[in-house]
């Protein structure tokens, strides 16, 4: 099965995969929309298991939403009902699939790192106004095909948002209670490279070498946070996306300087790793990061997004108490 987004057909990507697989391809689902929602996925899930229950492999082609959708589709309980999966996520309990598929990921953006992680994000914008994260041993990709050529058609806004998502993944893996030497290695390299490459890429969108460097940085950031999970900046971002409509890449990155200020001084070992990203200058790191974001046209104040000071304070307090917020090294301080 091929799971992808509608625009992949116009870009020639869907046809290319269909030609390569020929009769081995059971079918194509190309109705993936940004930020998969419970209401949209429920009928797609039922149709998938009814029509393609016997297929063995899912190929996910697209950005984070396509990869997330594939992971959500590929696991089923005894009753093949999407509601069973959603109820388990909502209750915070275990979902133990009785049937699964193998997954091959082919990212067309350089940001989510989903090609090398087991996580899939699911949104409920209509009933419970929540964000869920699926994370199962079965949803780890079996293989990832990272071809920077597939990212060259990305427009300016998506390139920016994807790159900032990757940067957030890298930094969130550093100020994280689950950090380890392996995640640190990936995170530092990813953060440094993305901060170097992204400003250049924004003025040279068709540069193949820059696209390749961004794709590698995003993959390395994915490897970093696949070890640690994300932390406070992502926890804050969920409300910003659900309630204020902010694209995820902006929502999870505009608070990075503020979160960094909260992180610095909490743990000497984390300060030392952060310093590696900013040429040893930990004291000026938040200001450098603010200047970097502002230079890309990203404001770093809640007020720029229509959020009042009381609302932002409440949002931060709630985020610190959330599952991702509790990964932050300053959450219990």
What do these predicted regions represent?
Residues 1-57, 302-303:
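ATP/NTP phosphate-donor binding region
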Residues 167-171, 214-222, 256, 289, ...:
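Short alpha-helical scaffolding segments that buttress acidic/His motifs in well-ordered protein cores
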Residues 39-46, 50-148:
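Glycine/threonine-rich beta-strand-loop-alpha-helix active-site module
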Residues 239, 243-301:
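Active-site pocket-lining segment
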Residues 111, 219-252, 322-326:
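Glycine-rich phosphate/pyrophosphate-binding beta-alpha loops
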Residues 119-228, 328-330:
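Carboxylate- and glycine-rich phosphate/diphosphate-binding segment that chelates Mg2+/Mn2+
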Residues 138, 274-333:
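C-terminal charged capping/lid subdomain of soluble metabolic enzymes
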